[in-house]
Amino acid sequence: MVELTITGDDDDILSMFFDEEFVPHAFVDILLSNALNEDQIQTQSVSSLLLTRLDFYTKNLTKELESTIWNLDKLSQTLPRTWASSRYHKEAEQNDSSLYSTESLKSSKLEYYLDTLASAVRALETGMHNVTEKLSDLDNENNRNTNVRQQLQSLMLIKERIEKVVYYLEQVRTVTNISTVRENNTTSTGTDLSITDFRTSLKALEDTIDESLSSAIDNEAKDETNKDLIGRIDSLSELKCLFKGLDKFFAEYSNFSESIKSKAQSYLSTKNIDDGMIS
């Protein structure tokens, strides 16, 4: 038998037969009409070559078709009993019930492969769902941590403000008790404070500050300052806002505040330092 190899020209010849507009009898008519004008021996040679090619292509196409049919038939065959049994038990365990009848033991290989692929896809979906849930839990935990941190910061701020309020109230109590301490040498027992007592307390405190400033001027060098005393005067000046709404007390404390700040500025003017230590 003559062996033939498929070349580019052979592909072109073969592709002609796959043309949707190909007309077999028209092809034969053209072939025979051309043969009438050629030598008979040459015509027989061409015909023999065409028949040989036809036989070759037919056998190859038949072989490929048989192989394809065999593969499809193989996929449609019933699974071996061990494969089918393991698949049945696995699916029964996953679904926690016997949802598959004995007919499932006769599944084909193709169905087995498709079911295996479907199981893998479901497992992937479950994994993605678990990952999504974990990410969501982490986000919620981060949000909770952020809220706790913000609450802690708020509580710290509240604590700081409360401590400042307590400090100012202690300062006010100290101021209002000065006159009582001077007269009775004891602290106030919480009795009502008159405007006269309040004025007396402020006057006594102002005299004490004035004496401290005078002593500092006499005993300090030009480049030294009593920062504790200046800080104390600044703190007492800040208490003025606490007396707003108490007209008589506010007026008395305003005069006191302006007086001690003026004395502090006079003290600082004797020093070789920059201005602005008193707010």
From Swiss-Prot:
Subcellular localization, as worded in the UniProt entry: Golgi apparatus membrane
Species annotation: Saccharomyces cerevisiae (strain ATCC 204508 / S288c)
Keywords associated with the record: Golgi apparatus, Membrane, Protein transport, Transport
Function: Acts as a component of the peripheral membrane COG complex that is involved in intra-Golgi protein trafficking. COG is located at the cis-Golgi, and regulates tethering of retrograde intra-Golgi vesicles and possibly a number of other membrane trafficking events.
Name used for this protein in its record: Conserved oligomeric Golgi complex subunit 7
Main location: Golgi
Subunit and interaction comment: Component of the conserved oligomeric Golgi (COG or Sec34/Sec35) complex which consists of eight different proteins COG1-COG8.
Highest taxon above the source species: Eukaryota
One of the protein's GO biological processes: cytoplasm to vacuole targeting by the Cvt pathway
Bilayer topology: Peripheral membrane protein
One cellular component (GO) term of this entry: mitochondrion
